[in-house]
Amino acid sequence: MYLHLGQSVVVRTATIIGIFDIENTSMSKLTRHYLAQAEKNGRVINVSPELPKSFIVCEDHKKITVYISQISPATLKKRTGFVAGLANL
Protein backbone atom coordinates (compact mmCIF):
# COMPACT_ATOMS: atom_id res chain seq x y z
CA MET A 1 0.00 0.00 0.00
CA TYR A 2 0.98 3.63 -0.37
CA LEU A 3 0.70 6.72 1.80
CA HIS A 4 0.18 10.20 0.33
CA LEU A 5 2.50 12.68 2.12
CA GLY A 6 1.30 15.81 0.33
CA GLN A 7 1.59 17.43 -3.09
CA SER A 8 2.43 14.55 -5.45
CA VAL A 9 4.59 12.54 -3.05
CA VAL A 10 3.63 9.01 -2.05
CA VAL A 11 5.66 6.34 -0.27
CA ARG A 12 5.14 2.63 0.20
CA THR A 13 3.85 2.01 3.73
CA ALA A 14 6.24 -0.93 4.08
CA THR A 15 9.18 1.49 3.91
CA ILE A 16 7.98 3.76 6.74
CA ILE A 17 10.07 3.56 9.90
CA GLY A 18 8.26 6.34 11.74
CA ILE A 19 5.97 9.36 11.52
CA PHE A 20 6.91 12.20 13.86
CA ASP A 21 5.44 15.54 14.97
CA ILE A 22 8.06 18.06 13.90
CA GLU A 23 7.09 20.65 16.53
CA ASN A 24 7.34 18.31 19.52
CA THR A 25 10.34 16.27 18.43
CA SER A 26 12.46 19.19 17.22
CA MET A 27 12.75 20.35 20.84
CA SER A 28 15.23 17.51 21.31
CA LYS A 29 18.86 18.29 20.51
CA LEU A 30 19.29 14.74 19.16
CA THR A 31 16.38 15.12 16.74
CA ARG A 32 17.63 18.49 15.51
CA HIS A 33 21.08 16.95 14.98
CA TYR A 34 19.58 13.96 13.12
CA LEU A 35 17.56 16.21 10.81
CA ALA A 36 20.57 18.49 10.21
CA GLN A 37 22.75 15.51 9.28
CA ALA A 38 20.06 14.09 7.00
CA GLU A 39 19.80 17.49 5.29
CA LYS A 40 23.58 17.75 4.95
CA ASN A 41 23.74 14.27 3.39
CA GLY A 42 20.97 15.07 0.89
CA ARG A 43 18.48 12.64 2.43
CA VAL A 44 15.71 15.19 3.13
CA ILE A 45 12.83 15.82 0.74
CA ASN A 46 10.57 18.78 1.46
CA VAL A 47 7.15 17.77 0.24
CA SER A 48 5.70 21.28 0.34
CA PRO A 49 6.90 24.85 0.89
CA GLU A 50 4.15 25.25 3.51
CA LEU A 51 4.79 25.19 7.26
CA PRO A 52 5.95 21.64 8.13
CA LYS A 53 3.97 19.62 10.64
CA SER A 54 5.61 16.22 10.41
CA PHE A 55 8.61 14.30 9.23
CA ILE A 56 8.51 10.75 7.99
CA VAL A 57 11.54 8.47 8.05
CA CYS A 58 11.58 5.78 5.37
CA GLU A 59 14.05 3.05 4.46
CA ASP A 60 14.04 1.58 0.97
CA HIS A 61 16.82 -0.69 -0.25
CA LYS A 62 18.94 0.24 2.81
CA LYS A 63 18.66 3.94 1.95
CA ILE A 64 17.13 6.27 4.57
CA THR A 65 15.05 9.21 3.33
CA VAL A 66 13.40 11.85 5.52
CA TYR A 67 10.28 13.51 4.13
CA ILE A 68 9.14 16.85 5.58
CA SER A 69 5.37 17.21 5.19
CA GLN A 70 2.73 19.85 5.84
CA ILE A 71 0.28 17.12 6.85
CA SER A 72 -0.10 16.45 10.57
CA PRO A 73 1.22 13.17 11.96
CA ALA A 74 -2.27 12.34 13.27
CA THR A 75 -3.73 12.60 9.77
CA LEU A 76 -0.93 10.51 8.28
CA LYS A 77 -1.35 7.85 10.95
CA LYS A 78 -5.12 7.77 10.33
CA ARG A 79 -4.45 7.27 6.64
CA THR A 80 -2.14 4.33 7.38
CA GLY A 81 -4.83 2.85 9.62
CA PHE A 82 -7.41 3.31 6.90
CA VAL A 83 -5.14 1.57 4.41
CA ALA A 84 -4.46 -1.26 6.87
CA GLY A 85 -8.22 -1.56 7.47
CA LEU A 86 -8.85 -2.01 3.75
CA ALA A 87 -6.50 -4.98 3.71
CA ASN A 88 -8.83 -6.78 6.13
CA LEU A 89 -11.86 -6.53 3.82
Question: Model-found features: residue ranges?
Answer:
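Eukaryotic intrinsically disordered, low-complexity regulatory linkers and tails enriched in Ser/Thr/Pro
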Residues: 1-89
